[in-house]
UniProtKB/Swiss-Prot annotation:
Phenotype of null mutants: Myl2 homozygous die at 12.5 dpc, which is associated with ultrastructural defects in ventricular sarcomere assembly, that included disruptions and disorganization of the normal parallel alignment of the thick and thin filaments, narrower fiber widths and larger distances between Z disks and misalignment of Z-band between sarcomeres.
Classification via PROSITE patterns: EF_HAND_1, EF_HAND_2
Domain of life: Eukaryota
Domain EF-hand: 24-59, 94-129, 130-165
Modified sites of kind N,N,N-trimethylalanine: 2
Record Pfam families: EF-hand_7 (PF13499)
Other observations noted: This chain binds calcium.
Species in which this protein is naturally found: Mus musculus
Record note on quaternary structure: Myosin is a hexamer of 2 heavy chains and 4 light chains. Interacts with MYOC.
Gene name tied to this protein: Myl2
GO BP of this protein: cardiac muscle contraction; cardiac myofibril assembly; heart contraction; heart development; heart morphogenesis; muscle cell development; muscle cell fate specification; negative regulation of cell growth
UniProt binding sites for Ca(2+): 37, 39, 41, 48
Main location: cytoplasm
MF terms (GO), sorted A to Z: actin monomer binding; calcium ion binding; structural constituent of muscle
Name by which UniProt lists this protein: Myosin regulatory light chain 2, ventricular/cardiac muscle isoform
Length: 166
């Protein structure tokens, strides 16, 4: 019995990170972790991060950038550590900032807009996929501009505040 208890303490630390989130949120984090754990060894490492960025279309990520991400963890990144890191980042996080950061992953130049076709592709093929109807509803409510770009900064503002920016 003692080895099991010791293992749990190592994995989970002294606080129960699982109590910070609802069960549905934990399941979503588990899906994200599984997507990022490219080699399916139960840990996210540098190669997993590089492969994840490549899958998202960012192939020229600097080693330093990946090293900085890995250094944020107190040790090997298993699911419990992953969940703890997100819990710490999201504690008191502004929902607008959280959603913006999700879009910024796809906008490394920081333009504030993305090609609508690219957004449609990402939302229908990655993680928790949107249906065609859901995408059509989103673009009906927030149509792209004449060049086919979606102003995601304005979209996020409307989602979180219910009104357009001035």
């Amino acid at each position: 019995m003692a080895p099991k208890k010791a293992k749990k303490r190592i994995e989970g630390g002294s606080s129960n990170v699982f109590s910070m989130f609802e069960q549905t949120q934990i399941q979503e984090f588990k899906e994200a972790f599984t997507i990022m754990d490219q080699n399916r060894d139960g840990f996210i490492d540098k190669n997993d991060l590089r492969d994840t960025f490549a899958a998202l279309g960012r192939v020229n990520v600097k080693n330093e950038e990946i090293d900085e991400m890995i250094k944020e963890a107190p040790g090997p990144i298993n699911f419990t550590v992953f969940l703890t890191m997100f819990g710490e980042k999201l504690k008191g996080a502004d929902p607008e900032e959280t959603i913006l950061n999700a879009f910024k992953v796809f906008d490394p130049e920081g333009k504030g807009s993305l090609k609508a076709d690219y957004v449609r592709e990402m939302l229908t093929t990655q993680a928790e996929r949107f249906s065609k109807e859901e995408i059509d509803q989103m673009f009906a409510a927030f149509p792209p501009d004449v060049t086919g770009n979606l102003d995601y900064k304005n979209l996020v503002h409307i989602i979180t505040h219910g009104e357009e920016k001035d």
